[in-house]
């Protein structure tokens, strides 16, 4: 009997696992296509087997990492497992940080010591922006307090031996495979597939190798960042600190400055390839461990006409924006890749500046119709482009593309596979036939690999620029972007920007709300998704939310309240008499609510569902209250914080000028989710203050203050269906589960379609016409 019970339990577990796998997002499902575009070296990791671990799990490096004599003057520790630790209080911190951002992934950046990690992808990004293997190892040795472990040197050589050495360049509308290493070109040409891709002349002979010398000069003018009107990020080495710096390290810093400013002559060897075989060529180069790095020589592109667009004189780049663009245009060509900047730090201006630099047709893709409108406004604000040259393509706005230079659309519009309207088909045909110089991909972290491939096959662009604030995904598929778009070109430090006044100084707080006894009793008893509704609709959480809204409205603050659950969103907003936006809200109503929020002093609070997580530009907002969220998503937490990160006018930089409250019901699953969600922001240097009691809450007149009101709310929650407990599914959102089945409790009447059917009996007087031909027998029994 025990064996049978065990088998039954195993069956139930396997069914549960199967159900949970079916609940995964579409982009979580592994696909063959995402693997074929990743070189095998990219999956390699640093060997950590030699690291000793004590009984408490701490790593002991004392025997492996002997200190140098002048270690106090050097800012880095390089551990054998690939982790690098940087002293943020070092006088040469700025130079060391710039170098580490180029070669490693930031892991954690609190106030005093920052942690980075060497990965295959970060080293791929390093060589793609011009760093050589010898440069990386030499710089690490000079900056490190200890000797660099041999395993780290071998790992760097393994990952950089082939990455970034071969480029696919578009010049004069012809494609060339180019490299500054002639031996690599000869190695590639020995492969029969690549020889087949090589262009041949009329006699059938392969075209000759082309050797040329070009000067790498930045396409971004240095004057763009002068007079930036804000605090300088420069933290150069002061005169007092130079005496403590070893001579070899000081010479290295001076050389780094010269390398950034000097023009460099590079000799390259290239051969021309057939345009129709580009995709086959790229796949073959990846198999040979020489992935092609795409570069666009836009200055020599004569086939695609220049568009009439320039930056306005009022558009002034901040130092970090200029630095990110220098990574993109560092050698006079446009590199494809991803730029990571915090929300509110001016990603849109970076995109507009890139479009003004390339000066070719530009396609911008966002993730909602609101973001399309905001991108159009950003182009008109920062550039000289005429309104008639901007074309929008959304479900609501389909501008005529005649004479269009900048097209703005959404991922869902381009990736749409079902039947379109006649007008939409015409616009799609026009998008497909255009040769785009630049494609700007906003909120690029949200795009699953398969969806993005679909977009790539529809439109062709010479250069792709991805913009995001959070290069993280819970499914670890963010690495796919390295080969679908390009390497990470630049990532800013959130705390540095905050301390310099470029983004708001935010006080993050987690407010613990005790569950009322009645709600907690039901929470423990119920095992369905309705548990989510119970801890979201907790009366004490509602009262805390109402108190915070009243408190900040008295200070004339602008408040956004976020809720992933639509049932809770409506209940809170209607009870508090506040406007709310969610999926079905029309585009016109959304814009009206947002405009009122920005300019109407009487509208200081709005409620928004998950549709507002990204691409909602609300610079006036300085308070955010979160009442429900998407599980333990780190990305969503950072995106929501970004709604209040924009620098506030007239605020003192030393004081907190924005507030982020996350309301959590105590002793529920929500507390575990909250801890997971905060990981990304804590790694960026933010700290969360835990508030167990809001001072002054007892004096306020708040809703649900009596047991009767709380009992009525509980009955309303219990009467809701499991479908009400689910999160909102946003139309057009990638990975949505709208096409999948969902489990919920039901009754036999529901299954028969009788949910809204009422059985009623009533008497009606018979008309004379109906009783005219009645048999006498039945007349006798009539009442």
From Swiss-Prot:
Matching InterPro entries: ATP-dep_DNA_Helicase, ERCC3_RAD25_C, Helicase/UvrB_N, Helicase_ATP-bd, Helicase_C-like, P-loop_NTPase, XPB/Ssl2, XPB/Ssl2_N
UniProt biased composition (Basic and acidic residues): 1-11
Domain (Helicase ATP-binding) ranges: 328-489
Mod. after translation: Phosphorylation on Ser-752 by CK2 controls the 5'-excision activity of ERCC1-XPF endonuclease; phosphorylated protein inhibits the excision activity and thus NER. Dephosphorylation reactivates the 5'-excision step. Phosphorylation has no effect on transcription or the 3'-5' helicase activity.
EC assignment: 5.6.2.4
Compartments in which it is found: Nucleus
Regulation: Phosphorylation on Ser-752 by CK2 controls the 5'-excision activity of ERCC1-XPF endonuclease; phosphorylated protein inhibits the excision activity and thus NER. ATPase activity is stimulated by TFIIH subunit p52 (GTF2H4). DNA translocase activity by this subunit in TFIIH is stimulated by XPA, ERCC5/XPG and XFP plus ERCC1.
UniProt region (Disordered), positions on chain: 1-52
GO cellular component: transcription factor TFIID complex; transcription factor TFIIH core complex; transcription factor TFIIH holo complex
Domain of life: Eukaryota
Biased composition annotated in UniProt, kind: Acidic residues: 20-30
Motif (DEVH box): 442-445
Limits of the Helicase C-terminal domain: 543-703
PTM sites of type Phosphoserine: 34, 687, 752
Keywords: ATP-binding, DNA damage, DNA repair, DNA-binding, Helicase, Hydrolase, Isomerase, Nucleotide-binding, Nucleus, Phosphoprotein, Transcription, Transcription regulation
Residue numbers binding ATP: 341-348
Range of residues in the leader sequence: none
Known function: ATP-dependent 3'-5' DNA helicase/translocase; binds dsDNA rather than ssDNA, unzipping it in a translocase rather than classical helicase activity. Component of the general transcription and DNA repair factor IIH (TFIIH) core complex. When complexed to CDK-activating kinase (CAK), involved in RNA transcription by RNA polymerase II. The ATPase activity of XPB/ERCC3, but not its helicase activity, is required for DNA opening; it may wrap around the damaged DNA wedging it open, causing localized melting and twisting that allows XPD/ERCC2 helicase to anchor.
PANTHER family on file: GENERAL TRANSCRIPTION AND DNA REPAIR FACTOR IIH HELICASE SUBUNIT XPB, RAD25/XP-B DNA REPAIR HELICASE
Oligomer status and interactors: Component of the 7-subunit TFIIH core complex composed of XPB/ERCC3, XPD/ERCC2, GTF2H1, GTF2H2, GTF2H3, GTF2H4 and GTF2H5, which is active in NER. The core complex associates with the 3-subunit CDK-activating kinase (CAK) module composed of CCNH/cyclin H, CDK7 and MNAT1 to form the 10-subunit holoenzyme (holo-TFIIH) active in transcription. Interacts with PUF60. Interacts with ATF7IP. Interacts with KAT2A; leading to KAT2A recruitment to promoters and acetylation of histones.
UniProt-recorded name of the protein: General transcription and DNA repair factor IIH helicase/translocase subunit XPB
């Amino acid at each position: 009997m025990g064996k049978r019970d065990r088998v039954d339990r195993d069956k139930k577990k396997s069914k549960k696992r199967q159900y949970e796998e079916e609940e995964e997002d579409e982009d979580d499902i592994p696909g063959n296509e995402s693997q074929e575009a990743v070189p095998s070296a990219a999956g390699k990791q640093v060997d950590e087997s030699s690291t000793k671990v004590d009984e408490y799990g701490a790593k002991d490096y004392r025997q492996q990492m002997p200190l140098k004599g002048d270690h106090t003057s050097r800012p880095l520790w390089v551990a054998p497992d690939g982790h690098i630790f940087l002293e943020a209080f070092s006088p040469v911190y700025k130079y060391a940080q710039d170098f580490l951002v180029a070669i490693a992934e930031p892991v954690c950046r609190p106030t005093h010591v920052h942690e980075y990690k060497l990965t295959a992808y970060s080293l791929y990004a390093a060589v793609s922006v011009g760093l050589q293997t010898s440069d990386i190892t030499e710089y690490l040795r000079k900056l490190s307090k200890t000797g660099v472990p041999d395993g780290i040197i071998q790992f760097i050589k393994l990952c950089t031996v082939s990455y970034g050495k071969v480029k696919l360049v578009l010049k004069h509308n012809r494609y060339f495979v180019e490299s500054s290493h002639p031996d690599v070109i000869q190695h590639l040409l020995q492969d029969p597939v690549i020889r087949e891709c090589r262009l041949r002349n009329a006699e059938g002979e392969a075209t000759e190798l082309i050797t040329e010398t070009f000067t790498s000069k930045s396409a971004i003018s240095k004057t763009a960042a002068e007079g930036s009107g804000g605090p300088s990020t420069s933290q150069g080495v002061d005169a007092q600190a130079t005496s403590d710096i070893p001579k070899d390290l000081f010479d290295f810093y001076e050389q780094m400055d010269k390398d950034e400013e000097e023009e460099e002559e590079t000799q390259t060897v290239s051969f021309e390839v057939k345009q129709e075989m580009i995709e086959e060529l790229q796949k073959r180069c990846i198999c040979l461990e020489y992935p092609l790095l795409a570069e666009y020589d836009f200055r020599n592109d004569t086939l695609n006409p220049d568009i009439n667009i320039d930056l306005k004189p009022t558009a002034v780049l901040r130092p970090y924006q200029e630095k990110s663009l220098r990574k993109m245009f560092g050698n006079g060509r446009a590199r494809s890749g991803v730029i990571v900047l915090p929300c509110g730090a001016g990603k849109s201006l970076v995109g507009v500046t890139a479009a003004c630099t390339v000066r070719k047709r530009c396609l911008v893709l966002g993730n909602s119709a609101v973001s399309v409108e905001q991108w159009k406004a950003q182009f008109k604000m920062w550039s000289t482009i005429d309104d008639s040259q901007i074309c929008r393509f959304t479900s609501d706005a389909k501008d005529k593309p005649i004479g269009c230079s900048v097209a703005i659309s959404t991922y869902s519009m381009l990736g749409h596979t079902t039947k379109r309207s006649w007008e939409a088909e015409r616009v799609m045909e026009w998008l497909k036939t255009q040769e785009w110089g630049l494609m700007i991909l906003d909120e690029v972290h949200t795009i699953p690999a398969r969806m993005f491939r679909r977009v790539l096959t529809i439109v062709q662009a010479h250069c792709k620029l991805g913009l995001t604030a959070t290069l993280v995904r819970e499914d670890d598929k963010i690495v796919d972007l390295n080969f679908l778009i390009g390497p990470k070109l630049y990532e800013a430090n959130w705390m540095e920007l905050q301390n310099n006044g470029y983004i708001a100084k935010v006080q993050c707080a987690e407010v613990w709300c005790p569950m009322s006894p009645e709600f907690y009793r039901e929470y423990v008893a119920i095992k369905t998704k309705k548990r989510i509704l119970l801890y979201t609709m907790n009366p004490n959480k509602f009262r805390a939310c109402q108190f915070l809204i009243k408190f900040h409205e008295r200070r004339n603050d602008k408040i956004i309240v976020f809720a992933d659950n639509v049932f809770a969103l409506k209940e809170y907003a209607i009870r508090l008499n506040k406007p709310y936006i969610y999926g079905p809200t029309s585009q016109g109503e959304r814009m009206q609510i947002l405009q009122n929020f920005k300019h109407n002093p009487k509208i200081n609070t709005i409620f928004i569902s998950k549709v507002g997580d990204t691409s909602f530009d609300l610079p006036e907002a300085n308070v955010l209250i979160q009442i429900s969220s998407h599980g333990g998503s780190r990305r969503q937490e950072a995106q929501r914080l970004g709604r209040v990160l924009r620098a506030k006018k007239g605020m003192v930089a030393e004081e907190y000028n924005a507030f982020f409250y996350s309301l959590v019901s105590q002793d529920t699953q929500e507390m575990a989710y909250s801890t997971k969600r905060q990981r990304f922001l804590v790694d960026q240097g933010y700290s969360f203050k835990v508030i167990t009691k809001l001072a002054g809450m007892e004096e306020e007149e708040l809703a649900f203050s009596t047991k009767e009101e709380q009992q009525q709310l509980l009955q309303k929650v219990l009467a809701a269906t499991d479908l009400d407990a689910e999160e909102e599914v946003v139309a057009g959102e990638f990975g949505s589960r709208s096409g999948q089945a969902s489990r919920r409790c039901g009754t036999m009447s529901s299954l028969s379609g009788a949910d809204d059917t009422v059985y009623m009996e009533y008497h009606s007087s018979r008309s004379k016409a109906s009783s005219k031909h009645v048999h006498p027998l039945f007349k006798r029994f009539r009442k």
